[in-house]
Amino acid sequence: MPVQPCSLPAGFLPAAVSLPSQQTVIAEDETGKATIYHDAPLPIPEPHMVLVKTIAVSINPCDWKMPSRFPAPGARIGCDFAGIVLSIGPEAARIRRDLRIGDRVCGGIHGSNPIDLPSGSFSQYVAAHADLLLKLPNKLSFAQGAVLGGSVFATLWIALYESLGLEGTPDMPLQDDPPPVLVYGGSTSTGTAALQILRLSGYRPIATCSPHNNDLVRAAGAEKVFDYRSETCAADIKSYTNGRLRHVLDIITDLQSQLICYDTFSRVGGKYTCLEQPAEELHLRRTVRKEMIVGLAASGKEIALADGYERTANPQLRARSGEFFQTIQRLVDEGKFVPHPTRTVEGGFEGILKCLDILKSGGTSGEKLVVFLDRENP
């Protein structure tokens, strides 16, 4: 029996191509294991969304950590993607007048979502928030677009500005006596993005990484790089910053990173922002204010996780995040923001499963894994 085409909700601009009713996706099975399914329905986009044909995806640590920690049978996995706009919702057309059917875009969505099972980028088609999309300039490939994605920028808006409370932005950088900001995990994709944004915002970014990634991290904007494996790492950072360090972003958030980050502060203390739940027993210094942020909250929707990762709906945060994406779009268009280095893994959906295993085993350093789901558009 032939597959019946998919129908879009009322008000959507007609799709550029005929849409099937089923697609291939990677979703969680009953135990949370990433599994390939070939008979999944297409997502039904909301009025403020666009429907995107996925060309390439990048793989993040959260793509294996979330199903492992918060299994949600049936939830589709994956956050970051690059693809082609197929249809635009009526509200999306109003808030993004620059978007056109056929545009090359990238973005991020909430994969492994227990209250929105069809949301996940490891799919042939995704429904994405229009105001959290970036248009890809011709000089950037789909692989680079998948690495840009959207989850990094959502995370960094919340981390740098909502949590750390930094005042300088790429639109209005600091002019006088810029303070240092430490990025622990500078060679990660989030790290190189943070360093570029900090530099463009007028700060003095410093970072930790493995020595073989020093050139990458310096190129991203770090004025000084420290070896996190050195026994004197924290002392070296404290000495270099002359006790002026007040803002630390810990991208790694393991026991070692937390110990080092806390020891970089002087007695005056400061703000420590991390991306995973920190160890409570470490946080005995009252002068250091800690906060664990969840980048997914930039969508403005409820984050129905647990163990401190849950968040209530926050439309105002969504609006501020959307404004930040406009800033990032300008930087990308002007060539002022450089995507993280890519490593393409072949195999389509099977390649994604391979990448998840690579990340679990710690098999990447200074690069982002990318898989193409449509090789006709490399």
UniProtKB/Swiss-Prot annotation:
Gene Ontology MF terms in the entry: nucleotide binding; oxidoreductase activity, acting on NAD(P)H
Pfam family, one: ADH_N
Amino-acid positions noted as binding NADP(+) in the UniProt annotation, renumbered to this chain: 62-65, 187-190, 210-213, 228, 275-276, 364-365
Keyword Oxidoreductase: yes
Entry-linked CDD domains: enoyl_reductase_like
Induction: Expression is positively regulated by the oxaleimides biosynthesis cluster-specific transcription factor poxB.
InterPro entries assigned: ADH-like_N (IPR013154), GroES-like_sf (IPR011032), NAD(P)-bd_dom_sf (IPR036291), PKS_ER (IPR020843), Trans-enoyl_RdTase-like (IPR047122)
Residues reported to bind substrate: 151-158, 295-299
Pathway the protein contributes to: Secondary metabolite biosynthesis
Annotated signal peptide: none
EC number: 1.-.-.-
Keyword terms, alphabetized: NADP, Nucleotide-binding, Oxidoreductase
Enzyme class label: oxidoreductase
Quaternary structure, from the entry: Monomer.
Function statement: Trans-enoyl reductase; part of the gene cluster that mediates the biosynthesis of oxaleimides, cytotoxic compounds containing an unusual disubstituted succinimide moiety. The first step of the pathway is provided by the HR-PKS poxF that serves in a new mode of collaborative biosynthesis with the PKS-NRPS poxE, by providing the olefin containing amino acid substrate via the synthesis of an ACP-bound dec-4-enoate.
Family: Belongs to the zinc-containing alcohol dehydrogenase family.
Identification of the protein by name: Trans-enoyl reductase poxP
Gene: poxP
